[in-house]
């Protein structure tokens, strides 16, 4: 029997939102998981507390020097049963990110148990509609109140929950417009591109805003050395379908190792598609398009799962992929992947982790 996590109960519970108007990241549940770290006693006081503001020092090192990492995963409900999707992979990546920023690693099993108990307490918040889920955001930041660049001796970990609606607002995938960034870079090898650190996202915002002003949804980043090889999209890994083969840039230390990316690769192979992980230059991609070999492009990530790319612009040239329609392989992967997530298709890989009732 797992040890129960201490719970500090609220006096009153929130009114739950209309599930037809959820959107993404707008509403938060009644409770959150809290965990503190001090250098002299390690991680301690794992507990579930009411969701609300927290108090930190104005000199908290995480605010000044950027020691802050996060994760994102989801829980799904079907016929009253709630299941997490590959949470072990998220906590492994969380520890990799923590190590890169010289932050203390967590006990993955202990944290997963705490998450299960939190989600069980909040299971009434898990929406059950088509494409809906409970978004889960674990994050860790430095809290020691002292100035001076150096690793903090104190940290706080929180996990907050947000009921979220269908990403596309309906059953049809909507192709996105992508702008290839050729001035700014996201990351370089030896840096923090492989880690899910807050600063990576802050550094991407200027290019993202510029792309939005030009009418594009997201930015496709090139490598930080030659600005020649494709790496990833702002919030997604990227895939290409050429002559029926599924291709994605190989992990090189500057690309985030997405859990959705990893799962899509495994799933595509299981479905009989040839999958190739390798370097892909932007010039090669456009040449493949000109030859009629590039038939589909899609991104993968926790929020959208799979997002087809309909338009791609690089320098002064814009191409339209598959007549701006979702490709056959893209749709197949999306249907099977989401079917496994929400429990309507068999989970042959053991990716779903059912949340017990404590």
Curated annotation (Swiss-Prot):
Pathway: Amino-acid biosynthesis; L-isoleucine biosynthesis; L-isoleucine from 2-oxobutanoate: step 4/4; Amino-acid biosynthesis; L-leucine biosynthesis; L-leucine from 3-methyl-2-oxobutanoate: step 4/4; Amino-acid biosynthesis; L-valine biosynthesis; L-valine from pyruvate: step 4/4
N6-(pyridoxal phosphate)lysine sites (modified residues): 196
Gene Ontology BP terms: isoleucine biosynthetic process; L-leucine biosynthetic process; L-valine biosynthetic process
Record carries keyword Coiled coil: no
Record key words, sorted: Amino-acid biosynthesis, Aminotransferase, Branched-chain amino acid biosynthesis, Pyridoxal phosphate, Transferase
Names of required cofactors: pyridoxal 5'-phosphate
Residue intervals passing through the bilayer: none
Cited Gene3D superfamilies: 3.30.470.10, D-amino Acid Aminotransferase, subunit A, domain 2
UniProt EC number: 2.6.1.42
Catalytic activity field: L-leucine + 2-oxoglutarate = 4-methyl-2-oxopentanoate + L-glutamate; L-isoleucine + 2-oxoglutarate = (S)-3-methyl-2-oxopentanoate + L-glutamate; L-valine + 2-oxoglutarate = 3-methyl-2-oxobutanoate + L-glutamate
Keyword ATP-binding: no
GO molecular function: L-isoleucine-2-oxoglutarate transaminase activity; L-leucine-2-oxoglutarate transaminase activity; L-valine-2-oxoglutarate transaminase activity
Family statement drawn from the similarity comment of this UniProt entry: Belongs to the class-IV pyridoxal-phosphate-dependent aminotransferase family.
Function: Acts on leucine, isoleucine and valine.
PANTHER family in the record: BRANCHED-CHAIN-AMINO-ACID AMINOTRANSFERASE, SUBGROUP IIII AMINOTRANSFERASE
UniProt-recorded name of the protein: Probable branched-chain-amino-acid aminotransferase
Organism per entry: Staphylococcus aureus (strain MRSA252)
